[in-house]
Structures are given as structure tokens and as C-alpha cells.
Amino acid sequence: MNLIDAAQHTATAGLPDLVRAAQGGDSMAMAELLDALAPYVARLCGPIALDDGADAAQEALITIFTSIGQLREPAALFGWVRVIAIREAVRVAKKAHRAATTELQDVPARGDPQLASDVRDVLRRLAPDHRAILVLRDLEGLDEQTVSDMLAVSAGTAKSRLHRARRRFRQEWDR
């Protein structure tokens, strides 16, 4: 079970009920739902949108707020939220059109703080599309088809983009 799965597992108790209440117009339930989702959305948006991660997370939460009625199955909440967050993060990162110069915040450190810092430095130098695919495949652990669906690209495009992103990451790592 990866870090995200563990966080989802501990945070999901009662969320389907909150979703249904929010869909029914309960503003308190909506506020509680958005509060529960905010850290997850921020973890997804940060590594992709970098210094604009907070803006991307806010835009994603707004989309969740305005579109909650479109979620057909409350049990699919995290998958639905993940799609929204990733798309917003990529959109915001592309819109920025500038090199990221601030620290990447939400890459989990596994043991060695220097290694985590080095990984953040390399990710900072990658294009938003490359960061997105690396986060989804290598941090989130999603399969190629799910990633291609989330990024609205063909499976072949996702596979080649992942290959290029990993190659670019290795090149930057070796610098």
C-alpha cells in the first residue's frame, strides 16, 4: 500500500455519506468534504504545478465544488478527484510558461533527506507534462491506461511521454 492509498484508507470513513449530502445541497457537508479532500488535492497538484501548486489545488477544489453533482458513484470519489486535480495542475503549469524556481514541496521523503532534495531539484527542471506522468505512474503507481485516461491522451502517447520523461529525468539526474 503506497502513501496515498494509506491516507485515502484512513480518511474515507464517512465520505460517501458526505458526498451524498453535498450533492443534496448540504453546505456544511460540502465544506467538510472539501476540507477532507484539500490535503490530497494539494499532494497531487504540488509536484506538477510546482510554485503554482496552491493555485492549481484551489482551482481543482472549485471544480469539485461546482461539479459534485456529476459524480455518479460516491465510492469513486478519489478517482474522480484525482482526474480533476491532475488536469488542473497540468493546465496551471502550462499556463505559467516559466521555469519553476521554488522548491517542490510534496514529494514524499523516504529516508534520506538529501535524496528527496535531489529528486525535487530534478523534477523542477522537467516540463509539466513530464512531471505529471512521472507523478501518476511512479508516485501514484497508476497503470498506463488509467494515466492516459486522466491526461486525456492515447495510451501510446502516455507510454512514449513516460519514456521521454524518465529519460529526461535520468539525464538531469546525471548532471
Kindly give the residue locations of the regions a language model identified:
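Amphipathic, Lys/Arg- and hydrophobic-enriched alpha-helical face
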Residues: L34-D51, S67, L123, D174
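Acidic, proline/glycine-rich intrinsically disordered inter-domain spacer in sigma factors
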Residues: A6-A7, A96-R124
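Helix-turn-helix DNA-binding module
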Residues: R124, P128, A132, E140-T157, ...
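Short, Lys/Arg-enriched C-terminal cap helix and immediately downstream tail that follows
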Residues: K94, R166-R175
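Extreme N-terminal regulatory/targeting segments of RNA polymerase sigma factors
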Residues: M1-R20
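Short, charged helix-capping/linker segments at alpha-helix termini
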Residues: L3-A6, Q23-A31, A42-E59, A155
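Arg/Lys-rich amphipathic alpha helix in sigma70-family domain 2
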Residues: T66-E73, V83-E103, D112
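Residue-level preference for hydrophobic side chains embedded in well-ordered alpha helices
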Residues: L33, L37, V41, C45, ...
